[in-house]
Design a protein with these regions (language model features):
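P-loop (Walker A) phosphate-binding loop of NTP-binding proteins
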Residues: 61
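Small-molecule kinase domains that catalyze NTP-dependent phosphoryl transfer to phosphate-bearing small molecules
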Residues: 159, 188-223
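ATP-dependent NMP and nucleoside kinases share a basic, alpha-helical "lid"
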Residues: 136-186
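Short beta-strand-centered segment that lines the nucleotide-binding/catalytic pocket of NTP-utilizing
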Residues: 79-92
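Extreme N-terminal, non-catalytic leader segments
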Residues: 1-3, 28-55
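Hydrophobic positions on the alpha1 helix immediately C-terminal to the Walker A/P-loop
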Residues: 69
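Conserved nucleotide-sensing/catalytic segment adjacent to the nucleotide-binding pocket
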Residues: 93-136, 149
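Conserved lysine of the Walker
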Residues: 66
Length: 223
């Protein structure tokens, strides 16, 4: 699938010293990612008029473009970004009961304690240890400065234990066919199988159990 490009007309009004209004039409090409990002930024800036900080969640299906959108938002608006991938379960946490529980496939307790609760308290520097899948252990602490808008990116970011902390919740979706194509392109045939057999079914179980998609504020399909 090629990137969808939209021609957008921006009208700029200028007032001269003689109070004559002149209009200049600027045409620029923007991708759907940028269009979506601008809509999200507008929503967040409106919320900033009422509270600070504003906490935004980007939830959705794997390979739907969550990380890509988060990167665009960070580039355009300078938001702080926190990734749910840094909060995978450690081996000792992956009990049979935990993995059978909808939404249990992430350490939401640690995400709550180390990210969301400090942000809600107004802490300006967040410290946490990302989980390293390669080594199956936590890495050294990282330090992230909390901006006026903080974005939580990744599947399970809208888990019921985390839901009420957010001011804006975004859901990204993708068709099964496009999802498979993207994962194959990114991870190869061998890398696709764990997604097909485990990760995608766990996500869909979680979405259905808590009606995550239906309850989110904004919904997008990212090209």
């Amino acid at each position: 699938t090629t990137k969808q490009v939209i021609t957008e007309k921006v009208i700029i009004e200028k007032v001269t010293p003689k109070k004559v209004i002149t209009k200049q039409v600027i045409t620029e090409k923007v991708t759907t990612k940028q269009v979506i990002a601008r809509e999200v930024i507008t929503k967040a800036e409106t919320l900033l008029n009422k509270k600070n900080p504003v906490l935004v969640a980007v939830e959705g299906r794997c390979a739907s473009g969550k990380t890509t959108l988060a990167s665009v938002l960070q580039d355009l608006a300078g938001w702080s970004v926190f990734h749910m991938d840094d909060f995978f379960l450690q081996p000792w946490q992956r009990t049979e009961l935990r993995m059978q529980t909808a939404g249990g496939n992430v350490d939401y307790e640690r995400f709550l304690a180390e990210i969301l609760e400090p942000l809600k308290k107004g802490e300006t520097e967040i410290v946490y240890r990302p989980y390293q899948c390669r080594y199956q252990k936590l890495a050294k602490p990282v330090y992230i400065k909390a901006k006026q808008v903080c974005l939580m990116e990744g599947s399970y970011s809208c888990h019921p234990a985390l839901w009420d902390f957010y001011d804006l919740r975004i859901f990204l979706t993708v068709s099964p066919q496009e999802q498979k194509r993207r994962i194959l392109a990114r991870n190869g045939e061998d890398g696709y199988m764990p997604f097909a057999k485990q990760w995608i079914p766990l996500e869909e179980q979680y979405f259905k159990a808590y009606q995550i998609e239906e309850r989110c504020d904004l919904h997008f399909t990212l090209c």
